[in-house]
């Protein structure tokens, strides 16, 4: 009996050490500050934002009537149909990107030689180019660019790395292909939200390491950067995040060690690996990057820690935060004044980051 207890204790100690030293990754508390550039600091949430929050409560209520085994299918269908694109002037062209389904999204002012790869969010399990057309159409407008929105492979049907490979394939392809066929790009960008923001940050590090043409600029909206679940706001902002809070409140009650082991098996990669947790990677030598996040959301500290670490490494990274906002509030930009404000900042950033790469040379004036 004594020998068995000693053996069991040894196993527990080994598992604990693996979890602490291998799965969690380095301590990132040194990068909790500064807090970033705050927008609309003293403004209360708009009436439009309060209406958005109320609508999210309706989603949670509807999901309670759906059998658990059908939750993912229901959420996928909801995302694809919840945000229809009302602007008939937007051009949508389906395209095959070296085996990855995708679509070109072009606003009337888009220059086909200016290209932006957009990587949609959805917790790596849902979402599509269709679900994010409101965002891709607006990115095309403010960037004066053709937007390539990819339908990357999702979990659980595919491993996490499959979606990562699709993003890499799309980047290589976009450098030499536009909406009108084979042609070189005059300017290239990448952007994504939430899980797509995670994939965006993973991609720009990979592009640097491969020596490929770097983006002129990148944008990440409320990105997830730490799959080891180390950010304080994951628990601290549960009650103030009306979108992610209700979905992940139950997970917050599970010990972090158990979630780390589950994540290791689910992703087939340790949670702190830089490919899926960009905050743990080398953040030097990155292109100009704008990160936007809400101070009320669960992922705000993922953004702060990533930006502060990248800035310390010498990369030109900017964090802009808004109070009160829901996760990826930019998706609601037709209704939300805060969403329109965020896109004004994005347009300004992309313009300033790509000066001299407009068709026909530099142009004066702001992007509308």
Please report, for each region that a protein language model flagged, where it lies by residue:
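Alpha/beta-hydrolase superfamily serine-hydrolase fold, recognizing
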Residues: 6-28, 89-368
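N-terminal targeting or regulatory segments adjacent to alpha/beta-hydrolase or S9 domains
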Residues: 1-82, 363-368
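Non-catalytic accessory segments of hydrolases
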Residues: 61-104, 110
């Amino acid at each position: 009996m004594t020998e068995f207890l000693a053996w069991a204790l040894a196993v527990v100690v080994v598992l604990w050490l693996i979890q602490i030293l291998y799965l969690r990754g380095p301590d990132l508390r040194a990068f909790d500050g500064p807090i970033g550039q705050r927008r609309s600091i003293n403004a209360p949430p708009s009436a439009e934002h309060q209406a958005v929050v109320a609508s999210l409560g309706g989603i949670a209520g509807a999901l309670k009537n759906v059998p658990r085994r059908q939750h993912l299918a229901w959420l996928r269908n909801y995302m694809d149909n919840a945000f229809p694109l009302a602007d008939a002037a937007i051009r949508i062209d389906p395209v095959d990107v070296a085996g990855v389904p995708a679509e070109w999204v072009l606003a009337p002012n888009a220059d086909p030689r200016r290209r932006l790869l957009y990587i949609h969010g959805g917790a790596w399990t849902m979402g599509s180019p269709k679900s994010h057309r409101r965002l891709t159409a607006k990115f095309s407008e403010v960037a004066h660019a053709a937007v390539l929105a990819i339908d990357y492979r999702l979990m659980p049907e595919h491993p996490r790395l499959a979606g990562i490979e699709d993003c890499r394939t799309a980047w290589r392809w976009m450098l030499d292909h536009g909406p009108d066929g084979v042609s070189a790009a005059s300017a290239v960008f990448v952007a994504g939200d939430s899980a797509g923001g995670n994939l965006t940050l993973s991609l720009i590090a990979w592009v640097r390491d491969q020596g490929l043409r770097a983006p002129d600029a990148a944008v990440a909206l409320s990105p997830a950067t730490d799959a080891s679940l180390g950010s304080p706001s994951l628990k601290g902002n549960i009650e103030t995040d009306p979108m992610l809070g209700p979905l992940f409140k139950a997970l917050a009650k599970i010990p972090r060690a158990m979630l780390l082991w589950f994540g290791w098996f689910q992703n087939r990669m340790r949670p702190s690996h830089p490919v899926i947790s960009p905050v743990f990677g080398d953040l030097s030598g990155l292109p100009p990057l704008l990160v936007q996040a809400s101070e009320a959301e669960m992922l705000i500290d993922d953004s702060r820690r990533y930006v502060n670490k990248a800035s310390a490494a010498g990369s030109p990274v900017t964090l802009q935060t808004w109070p009160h906002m829901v996760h990826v509030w930019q998706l609601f930009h037709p209704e939300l004044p805060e969403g329109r404000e965020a896109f004004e900042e994005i347009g300004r950033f992309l313009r300033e980051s790509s000066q001299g790469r407009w068709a026909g040379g530099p142009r004066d004036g702001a992007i509308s």
